[in-house]
A protein has these predicted regions:
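Mg2+-dependent phosphoryl-transfer enzymes with acidic/Ser/Thr/Gly-rich catalytic loops
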Residues: 1, 12, 18, 186-267
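Short active-site oxyanion
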Residues: 32-36, 56-57, 151, 210-211, ...
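Non-catalytic pre-domain segments flanking phosphatase-related domains
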Residues: 1-4, 23
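Active-site phosphate-binding/coordination module
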Residues: 16-121
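Conserved acidic, metal-coordinating active-site core of Asp-based
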Residues: 94-96, 101-215
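Short, structured coil segments at secondary-structure junctions
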Residues: 53-55, 62-63, 171-173, 227-228, ...
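Short hydrophobic/aromatic-enriched beta-strand-loop microsegments
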Residues: 56-63, 118-120, 177-179, 231-235, ...
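Active-site metal-binding loops of divalent metal-dependent hydrolases
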Residues: 8, 41, 64, 216-218
């Protein structure tokens, strides 16, 4: 099985999949290798890219909060509503920007920041971000919602405030938290991560961990890089990923996915 991240891994900086990367994934699938796409993106956006790749694949969205098998079987791991509201309250006290991803839409605190939105010059990227969203002023606007929450983003350009939030954040042990290169925290249920999702898929299809390759670049890829028998980091990836990986491939602008897979699989 090949588990692969989307942004800054399979996708280049324009949100395109290169022909080389696309073809090697198709070749792997034709050889009987299961393909799993694991991303922090929402399910709708992820499925558009999966459809473009053109092979049956498992889809893992919102950092492992939604796991959809090839046959459509779906596992949802949502956050307890009361607990996430307490976390949001902590963020508001520190005047931090946040957004909340639910079953229905994305709730942006005040307004979306530029780096919260994916930009691209191709049809997939443009369509993949047409997602319903609302602007809220405070948690008072969402506290009584009847929706399931999957992921909370905490964002700020000031690292000190982010660290202060981590010191004060309630229910830390109930969540899985990862940091992105854009200085934002991604907060999900403690049982929702790319690594745990990859294990669920492997168990479902009876795939040994010895037969798993994971490719990623960012903090939310760490758990799957550690779980896989072979963890591949992108050259443009975070240092923590490179240190844990078995191999560092070329960047997302240089067909890194192609060269990483070719290194370990004869296709």
């Amino acid at each position: 099985m090949i588990g692969i991240d989307l942004d800054v891994t399979l996708l280049n900086n324009r949100k395109l999949i290169s022909p080389k990367d696309l073809n090697i994934l198709k070749s792997a699938y034709e050889k009987g290798i299961h393909i799993a796409i694991l991303t922090g993106r929402n399910e709708y956006s992820t499925k558009l890219y999966a459809d473009y790749i053109g092979v049956k694949s498992s889809i893992i969205a919102n950092n492992g909060s939604i796991i959809k098998m090839e046959n459509g079987s779906t596992i949802i791991i949502d956050i307890e509503w009361d607990k996430i509201l307490e976390v949001i309250k902590c963020a508001e006290i520190l005047n931090l920007h946040y957004n909340l991803v639910t079953t229905e839409q994305i709730y942006y605190h005040r307004k979306p920041l530029k780096h919260e939105i994916f930009y691209g010059d191709n049809d997939i990227a443009n369509h993949s971000d047409v997602v319903k969203y609302s602007i809220i002023e405070s948690l008072e606007d969402i506290k009584d919602l009847d929706e399931k929450a999957f992921k909370l983003h905490i964002l700020d350009d000031n690292t000190w405030r982010i660290n202060k939030f981590l010191d004060k954040m309630p229910y830390k042990t109930d969540f899985d938290m990862t940091k992105t290169p854009e200085n934002q925290l991604e907060i999900c249920h403690k049982d929702a991560s790319k690594g745990s999702a990859l294990k669920i898929i492997a168990d479902y299809y009876d795939i040994s961990s010895d037969g798993i390759i994971a490719i990623g670049d960012s903090g939310n890829d760490l758990s799957m890089i550690e779980f896989a028998n072979i963890g591949i980091a992108m050259e443009n990836g975070m240092d923590i990923i490179k240190k844990k990986a078995n191999y560092i491939t070329k960047s997302n602008e240089e067909n890194g996915v192609y060269y990483g897979i070719k290194k370990f699989i004869n296709l």
